[in-house]
Design a protein with these regions (language model features):
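Ubiquitin-like/PB1-type beta-grasp interaction modules and other compact soluble beta-rich domains
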Residues: 1-88
């Protein structure tokens, strides 16, 4: 199974949802679709029309930058990382 790790900032929008999820391997797009089946509404937070990842969302598969077409292997780890902004 492919492991998906969600950021705490996203978990705050979905109370009770675990940070770690195991899903079937496939493209990042299919991984997000499967994740949305168990966490309804999460796809809308990650993907915009096109479809493509929202500008403030970064996805890494096995440490490499990814988009919706990136393939995830059986043992892949997918990190969803929101952009961080702010100033001093």
């Amino acid at each position: 199974m492919t492991t998906v790790l969600l950021p705490r900032s996203l978990l705050a929008l979905f109370p009770g949802v675990d940070r770690r999820h195991e899903v079937a391997p496939g493209t990042v797009g299919s991984v997000i679709a499967e994740l949305d089946a168990s966490v309804p509404g999460i796809r809308d937070r990650l993907v915009q029309a096109g479809p493509r990842l929202r500008p403030h969302i970064n996805v890494f598969v096995d440490g490499e930058p990814a988009d919706l077409a990136t393939q995830c292997a059986e043992a892949s780890v997918v990190h969803v990382i929101p952009a961080v902004s702010g100033g001093a």
